[in-house]
């Protein structure tokens, strides 16, 4: 599913091509590109969920949290997001690329990926997609885009 998401993002969204194709044509194009039907459906559902996240007040309690609040991960999140990825999320919060609200959107979207081995590169793509879909996050998106295309994130181990 991650491959389909990256393909869609690079082909349509990131390249500023207007996405006016209907879902059936899009599915046909993705099938012709070699993606499996199940992965296509999951990716399209994932994108719908992402769009829905910004329309709801599901993170209203997060918007009220202070900048000194510390995120405690559930066991399921710990199992799905390794230490390196969690550290990267914290790093992005510290340099103000992510807010508490966008961090929660990223975590929510990562947990729906149904992947056992989320790589740091996959996480970066998810973050980029989330920031692209949240109004007012253009600067954070640009910073994240730079981090995605450079291998050194400035993190120390």
Curated annotation (Swiss-Prot):
Concerning Pfam families, the annotation shows: DUF494
Residues annotated as signal peptide: none
> What is the similarity comment for this entry?
Belongs to the Smg family.
HAMAP family, per the entry: Smg
The protein's name = Protein Smg homolog
Gene transcribed to yield this protein: smg
């Amino acid at each position: 599913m991650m491959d389909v998401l990256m393909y869609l993002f690079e082909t349509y969204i990131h390249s500023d091509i207007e996405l006016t194709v209907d879902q059936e044509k899009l599915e046909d194009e993705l099938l012709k590109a070699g993606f499996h039907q199940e992965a296509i459906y999951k990716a399209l559902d994932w994108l719908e969920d992402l769009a829905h996240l910004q329309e709801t007040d599901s993170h209203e309690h997060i918007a009220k949290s202070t900048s000194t609040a510390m995120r405690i991960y559930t066991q399921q999140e710990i199992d799905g997001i390794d230490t390196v990825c969690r550290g990267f999320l914290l790093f992005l919060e510290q340099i103000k690329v992510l807010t508490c609200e966008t961090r929660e959107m990223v975590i929510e979207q990562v947990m729906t990926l149904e992947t056992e081995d989320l790589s740091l590169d996959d996480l970066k793509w998810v973050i980029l997609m989330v920031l692209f879909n949240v109004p007012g996050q253009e600067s954070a998106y640009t910073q994240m885009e730079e981090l995605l295309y450079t291998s050194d994130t400035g993190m120390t181990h």
